[in-house]
């Protein structure tokens, strides 16, 4: 799922570091954050509900929060979401109850995070999943049977050089996710067909992002209606 964590964002929190200075200035105006929330939320199911619905790939974007003294890491999409720790524990609870299920967690955007923040996040991942974490290896050698035999259930993709320091972090290049960046369904389908046919035959997984992306004029036209009412087909 896309922006998998964004079923809840906190409109009372500061605007996230993933936003431009212009958006941050606008957010000081009353009601602007309520409008932002309509465009930040891309899911209406919790992690648990998404898992129960069959989702096994999660697109995750994370950030530190200004003024947060304990170095907690939060999910982010314009506005701050829940703590990463809480989301990971919710996922682990499902996996413990379903020992043959395997999931992909794709940490692909990091904001306002220094080395200490990354270490904190990686520690949270270890604490949540422990021996369920599958070490990085050849994609071709990985089968469900192998995962079941070794009781591995979680593949973590980490789009940051810190992956090199931990055997259970897979490099981001192992799961490319080409992005169409369009509001046109026709262009999106053509893009998906093209990138699928051009994907690497070996050595990596592949994500087909079947999503429409609003442009500035899209948001301006559907400002009050929000993302779901404007782009969901």
Per-segment meaning from a language model:
Residues 55-56, 131:
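Short aromatic/hydrophobic-glycine micro-motifs
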Residues 136-233:
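Surface-exposed substrate-engagement region within the catalytic domains
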Residues 47-48, 91-92, 122, 126, ...:
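Short amphipathic alpha-helical segments and helix-helix/interface helices
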Residues 62-65, 107-110, 161:
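An acidic- and aromatic-residue-enriched active-site/binding cleft used to recognize and process polar
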Residues 1-53, 66-98, 102, 162-172, ...:
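Long, acidic (Asp/Glu-rich), low-complexity accessory segments flanking structured domains
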Residues 56-60, 103-107, 154-158, 206-208:
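Structural recognition of the beta-strand scaffold that forms the well-ordered cores
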Residues 76-133, 152-154:
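Intrinsically disordered, low-complexity acidic segments that are enriched in bulky aromatics
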